[in-house]
Amino acid sequence: MESEKIYMTANPYLCTECGKGYTCLASLTQHQKTHIGEKPYECKICGKSFTRNSNLVQHQRIHTGEKPYECNECGKAFSQSTNLIQHQRVHTGEKPYECNECEKTFSHRSSLRNHERIHTGEKPYPCNECGKAFSHISALTQHHRIHTGKKPYECTECGKTFSRSTHLIEHQGIHSEEKSYQCKQCRKVFCHSTSLIRHQRTHTGEKPYECNECGKAFSHTPAFIQHQRIHTGEKPYECNACGKAFNRSAHLTEHQRTHTGEKPYVCKECGKTFSRSTHLTEHLKIHSCVKPYQCNECQKLFCYRTSLIRHQRTHTGEKPYQCNECGKSFSLSSALTKHKRIHTRERPYQCTKCGDVFCHSTSLIRHQKTHFRKETLAE
C-alpha cells in the first residue's frame, strides 16, 4: 500500500482506460490518444498519420533523407537516435541483452528474440504455399523462392541469376580468375575457401552431416537436406500444370517435360531426341552394336542388363511391382505407374490444341491425330 501511495504521488495523472500514471496532464492527454485512435499529426508527403508530433518528425526524415544523429567513431549518420545507440555497440562491443537459457549475449533485442527460438522451437513464419514454418523471416523469404522461382541476385558479368546472395558471391569468383585456395592433396585450386573445404572431403571421406532418423551421413548439406525429405515426406517443388509435387527440383524439371513435350537431349547419330539424359545414354548403345547380355532361355541379346532382366520376366512370369490400392501386380514399373493413374485420376498429358488431358502418352497421340485429320480436311 505504501508503494502505491508513492507511485500515486509521483504520477498524479492517471489514465482511466489502463491505469497508467503520468507526471503532467500533457503527457496523459498524449497517451489517451492511443486508446481513442486519434492521430492528429499527418504527413503532408504521403498522408500517414501519427498520435504524436515527435513520431511525425521522425517519419518525415524518410522523405527528406535527414540523418541528424552521427556516430563520433566512424561518422555514419542515422535518422533516429535509437538506431545510433544500436550502431555504437559495434564500436563498444556492448551486448546488453542476455539469453536466460544459455547466457549468450546480444547487442540488439531483436537478435536475442531470434536466438531464443532455438530454445523454444518457435517458428512463427509459415509458408502460405506449403505450410512449412520458419523461425526467422529471412529463412521464409529464401524458402518462398522455391515456389516462385524468383532469383533476385544477378551477376553483372554474365547475367546469371541466383536465389541467394551467397550463391552469387561464390559464382563471381569464376569471373575474377583469382583462385587462391589450393588443395594440398591434388593441387586443384578454388576461388573460395568453402569450395576447397567441400572438395577436401573427397580425399578425407569426411561426412559431417548425419541424419537423426537413420544415421546416414553426407559430405555436403544439399545432399543431406534432400535426404531428409525421404523421412519428412516434404515435396516443396510443385508442378504448376498439374499440381504434382517432388522432393527434388531436378525431378520437377524432368516431369514438366511431359507437359511441354521438351526433349533437350539429342542423339548425334540419328537425331532422335529425349526428355532425359539417361534415356539418351541408353539409346546410344543401339548405335554401338554391342549387346553383351544374353538370355539363357531363348538366346536373345540385349544392350543393357536391365533390358535382359525385364525380358526374363516373360519366361518366369515374375511380377514384382504391386499396386498398393488394389493389389494388382506388374512385370514392369512403368506399367504400374500407368495403372496407378486409374486410382489417382492423374492425367499428365495435355493436348496443346484443345486442352484435353489424358492418362497415357499414346492416348494423347491418338487424340492429336483427330486434330490433324480435321486440319487436313479443312485444307
UniProtKB/Swiss-Prot annotation:
The answer to whether keyword Metal-binding applies is yes
Q: Where are the zinc fingers (C2H2-type)?
A: 13-35, 41-63, 69-91, 97-119, 125-147, 153-175, 181-203, 209-231, 237-259, 265-287, 293-315, 321-343, 349-371
Q: Which PROSITE patterns would you find in this protein's record?
A: ZINC_FINGER_C2H2_1, ZINC_FINGER_C2H2_2
Q: Where in the cell is it found?
A: Nucleus
Q: Which UniProt keyword terms apply here?
A: DNA-binding, Metal-binding, Nucleus, Repeat, Transcription, Transcription regulation, Zinc, Zinc-finger
Keyword field contains Lipid biosynthesis: no
- Record function comment: May be involved in transcriptional regulation.
The entry sums up its family as follows: Belongs to the krueppel C2H2-type zinc-finger protein family.
- Quote the protein name from its UniProt record: Zinc finger protein 883
Instruction: Provide the species name.
Output: Homo sapiens (Human)
